[in-house]
């Protein structure tokens, strides 16, 4: 991998204060699979907690990280701006010239955690922890990469659409995004005294 330089930390742990699509967090996690690992790359909106893009791979080559950014731009490009920051650690995937060029060509701004400081990307790390906890009973039963991917796909759909979170006004990430961009609280979720 041809390497570029690390980027400055533009986020400084101010994850939620800039609104939706302003700060996007990305990272890779290792997932056990039949005595080896498969790998998951995600891009998480720091404000809404939505998983905007993700890709899985059986290899740690940079391609699946690039695919994650490409999926982000394909599905959410219209809601991104030239001020949108994509924040990562200083791992080789994120300092590779391929990643740097893709992010710059996508008109996104790079930001990086300080070396070895997981707190600088804490919401992303926390997301992976919750995901693995909630999938703990399924992971041992995965017998193939396809089975792992199908399970992750189901969980991502559940997470974005149905997994309500206290910090998101008791809404799912997708409901919360709708709420903060339109001001409309989902009718089925209104407290009884409001109906």
Regions found by a protein language model. Give the residues of each.
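Basic, flexible linker segments flanking DNA-binding modules
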Residues: 1-19, 117, 174-182
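RNase H-like two-metal-ion nuclease catalytic core shared by retroviral integrases
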Residues: 1-2, 88-90, 96-97, 112-133, ...
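Mobile genetic element proteins and their domesticated derivatives, centered on retroelements
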Residues: 11, 27, 43, 49, ...
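An active-site-proximal beta-strand-loop segment
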Residues: 13-52, 58-60
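Active-site beta-loop-alpha junctions of metal-dependent nucleic acid enzymes
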Residues: 36, 55-79
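Short small-residue beta-strand/loop micro-motif enriched in glycine and branched aliphatics
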Residues: 50-54, 110-113, 137-138
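Alpha-helical structural signal in soluble globular domains
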Residues: 72, 98, 102-106
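C-terminal domain-tail junction helix/linker
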Residues: 104-108, 130-195
């Amino acid at each position: 991998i041809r390497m570029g330089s690390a980027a400055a930390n533009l986020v400084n742990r101010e994850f939620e204060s800039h609104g939706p699509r302003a700060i996007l967090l990305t990272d890779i996690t290792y997932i056990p699979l039949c005595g080896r690992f498969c790998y998951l790359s995600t891009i998480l909106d720091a404000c809404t907690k939505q998983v905007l893009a993700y890709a899985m791979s059986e290899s740690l080559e940079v391609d699946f990280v690039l695919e994650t950014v490409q999926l982000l731009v394909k599905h959410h490009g219209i809601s991104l701006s030239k001020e949108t920051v994509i924040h990562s650690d200083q791992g080789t995937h994120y300092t590779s010239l391929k990643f740097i060029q893709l992010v710059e060509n996508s008109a996104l701004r790079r930001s990086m955690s300080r070396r070895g400081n997981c707190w600088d990307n804490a919401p992303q790390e926390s997301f992976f922890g919750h995901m693995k906890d909630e999938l703990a009973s399924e992971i041992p039963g995965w017998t193939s990469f396809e089975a792992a991917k199908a399970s992750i796909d189901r969980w991502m759909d559940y997470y974005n659409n149905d997994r309500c979170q206290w910090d998101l006004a008791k809404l799912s990430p997708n409901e919360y995004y709708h709420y903060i961009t339109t001001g409309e609280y989902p009718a089925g979720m209104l407290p009884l005294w409001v109906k």
